[in-house]
């Protein structure tokens, strides 16, 4: 079975088994019945073996009751029978008294230890056990605490509830759980009976004595939880039910009746509130589920139906809306196949994306120019905005109102009383639910202030000198603020107006030809925030106000019942003292809508339960009750709504029966005037056509046909029947108005009409006689005319069936045929008629005939004796009718004969006909008898033949099966051998092709992403983003542990299969033990492993001294003879024939770095350009992969070639490098300080200060190189952090934060005012001093994570172990059922597109990266469009040509390695991220630090269908 169906099946069995774990009263009752029931005899005890059926019957009652609960989820009217409190309270009392009576009937004999019942049959025991457990389980969910029902409801609200396998698994889990309970009770009681019979008897006695009393007491206590309608009011009349719409009882859904806030099914205790003290009950916790609902129901914009909505935090709403705004999808997933066939659409789509790519590149160039002019980088970085309003203003995202800026940093306190005693005026106020007060604590908002302060005052802080150097200490960047934080902190920013970029510049690409109004419609949020009362879309400007945010909070706020009246404490204390802590105050509320004064309350004494809570109108032993406001909003879930129509239609049919049938179901008010006029005109035309054209024409044709058949015409009868037809003009609803038909007038304001026909004309071929018409029942005398000229029973009803035209004609033909048949069967001649007449006149013969007739009648009565008398009467009636028809024909024949013959001839014929009639009856009786005997013999012979045929067929099959068994075995052996031979051939051929592919693809490095080959169908396995995130998480931790991930990794995951393929190509898969791989093998493999290659930004943080160490090693290996030639040459000239064999002393290092001083000076002038390069170029241009290759070159044997090529490119530029963009990884070790304070000459002292760090790094790397295998490297212990230093650092940072918070929030602050001497000392100790805490802790932390090769070893070794245990490696390579990549493309795994750092990027840089991976240019074009962007800022043409030639070589090398992407594949690649929202949210919840991150699971829930 497929894994898509297996996973829900196992989940269903597990959840169904969990539903049976709690032991409720129904199970205890089943065990009691199992113990106590006896057979009924005095000397026989009911043993366990014979009582198994009773326990089984009781468990069947449990299962059947739970099955009814499951049906109640789909059919709410079933559950309404026992949930309604009136019915429930009345029914439950009767059940208890019946059970008490049954307990009294059980007699217990103490001497014999036997239990006796009055009933004797075992069936009564089983039936009683079934009914008792069934009724108790049905009454359990409301009266008794029943976790089984709660678990069942949670199960069916799960995401797999619509899958049939999940339902089957759930039912199987229920059966298995109860089966285990059945077997366990049997085993325990049997062992107890055999090992300790005395204890077994004592248990029976005690259960009989105390079980009934305890059960009844417990049931009555639980019954007190629900009010009885005869004693207590079922519903409070004084509550204003403005929000509850009046509905019929069967239209309400069962959660409304079960959790309705206006129904007293549960006692409600009011929490006491003390206004003077800030108790924890008063404080509103915004992220607590007790105060706010996670799910609520809102009406949709399109159809107005209610849908289930989830309250999203901002961390998920960012991804869901950014993808829609970036991708801008116009079509659904089902239309992708039709799109691929349309080439015109593909061309338009590619051209549109090219234009967008050029637009983004132009914006990058404009930002670079403004950076060169001196503007701040923070102003040019794109802010994360989601959409635009109608005025083209940016609006930030606020899906969850609790995360907005006006609510952030504040506390909420309850301001309302209990919801039971609120008036209409209270709900009209918007700010009536809660009041707002500011916090005085340090929250995230103040921490953000501290970071902003440090970044803005970096100039003042950097002026602090330590001995001889100036080093900046700010290593972080300010958090990207929301739109609200920007508005609140405008006064605190210290930006100069001269440096601010003007608004007229098109930096963000807003001046686009595309209409933003249409774009705004496409970027509508997928999870809307409409109110549940069906309000319209809220204006975006009003959302910024605090009142609107409070109204949104009110929608998801669940009010708790509170009571904060100001009672006099002295009076309460007196009451308590008088009652000796046994009595408590009870408050009775008046019936008025408003709260009464304190004088109107009567304080009677009630039982006090030693709780500081007011019980309200009902007292009980319950704690605090939270009234769930989510269920008050009518939870119209699709599980309940689409079944309500069945009940509504059932009651609607009953109402329609009582209504008059003449009243139509439609209404004319909604129709237009033109439509009414056309319909009335057509009706009147149909009436005229029917009366004057149609029916007269049919009458003429009918009579003409009758004359053709030599029948008399019926003109008079037809015209008289037609004259009886009357046309009555009625209103729209069928009420009679006036006789006659008139044409309607268009200009008259008349109501639409109906035309009624009284005594409608029925056209028949043969009109009935008067006697026949009187015998038949008259049909309906009226009918309505249709627009099509047809008759209906009622207006707008079904078409009336017209009588058959040929009915009487067919009846007459039957009579004629019967007469002719009788005439042919008569054999007697006309000569014997006289003798027959004489014999008939003889009385003896006449008596014989009468005797024969009587004998036949008696014989028929005997045959029909077993039948009912009614059938006999019906048979007699049929005989009489046939005789009557025969007589009518005979009379007509006689009338015709009298015209030509005499009276004597007539007498002769009459005598002959009588004799023929008698002879025909005798012959028919004989024929019936003979036919009966013949049919009986035929059946016997048929059975005998059928039996013989079956026996012969069985014998033949037996013989054939015996002979063919040997032949089948031979064919099976042949098939097995052939299949085995083919498998071996397939194995050898695949090995040969793998060997060829390894040789062909071994030295290639493909960079093109493989997103186009991803399947569009969603998989049910582990998501790829979750795997990548877990790998990243292990990388960031101290000790990586990937084995736990691989245990849950499914066998058919496509990402795992492709990793296996790639390892097979690299030659690593063949090793049985991956622990013994050498370092060189792993380095050769890691340089092509593109998926887990971190970005340049992360390498700069993890290994800042790696580049300096490599440069130092390079200059040490230079021979001394070559150094002199370098010093004598020009600074930028480098000899190509350098040999890297010897080394150099550290003392001459400064001299050798002098030729590269112009490069360092150019880099120092462009400090801001480096930052922007990290943000934009490294994430948008494909050419930056060369930097990663250059980084890997220092680990490989191709070191000489790569370095030689790099220095050769520098020689070609030759001093033209003022504005040259150099890779940021080459400058990660350089300090970033201001341009005007940078020293142009690098002194030897600064180099010596950094040499100890290099020496330290060298020792660590030398230690790693000495280790031969990765297994030994796994024993490397990381540097341990010092906890006391961390605590010291934390305390000092808190002191600095307090000083910043206390300062005034206005303008730019000078260093003399903001920074004191103590704070300067703290800053020096933390950041500037030699033994600074901050940098040391970071270095120790980086040393843990730096060993990335060990991480790769743990990652891939777990995959190899998984493959060696389960499946052969070659079988995995050939399985392509769920493969991500096509079989015809043999290339290594390359997924740079899925780097996790992309989530940090702003939207428009992420879009640029996606567009760069599409490669829209043609095949013959070697230089992509991005190359123009990189050298567009050169001033001279020569510089452009030199730089273009150097970069074109890199592009040519890259394009040789890339596969050409087709146009159709680009669209598939572009649409791929829309099917991966779940993966992106899975990553996003770990990266963005927002509250309540566990709610990302809503993306796993299926979209709720239309209701």
UniProtKB/Swiss-Prot annotation:
One of its GO terms (biological process) is protein transport. Involved in protein precursor import into chloroplasts. May be part of an intermediate translocation complex acting as a protein-conducting channel at the inner envelope. Belongs to the TIC214 family. It is found in: Plastid, Chloroplast inner membrane. This is Protein TIC 214. The gene is TIC214. Keywords: Chloroplast, Membrane, Plastid, Plastid inner membrane, Protein transport, Transmembrane, Transmembrane helix, Transport. It comes from Staurastrum punctulatum. Part of the Tic complex. The keyword Iron does not apply. InterPro entries: TIC214. GO terms for cellular component: chloroplast inner membrane. The chain crosses the membrane at residues 4-24, 53-73, 81-101, 129-149, 163-183, 202-222. It comes from the Eukaryota.
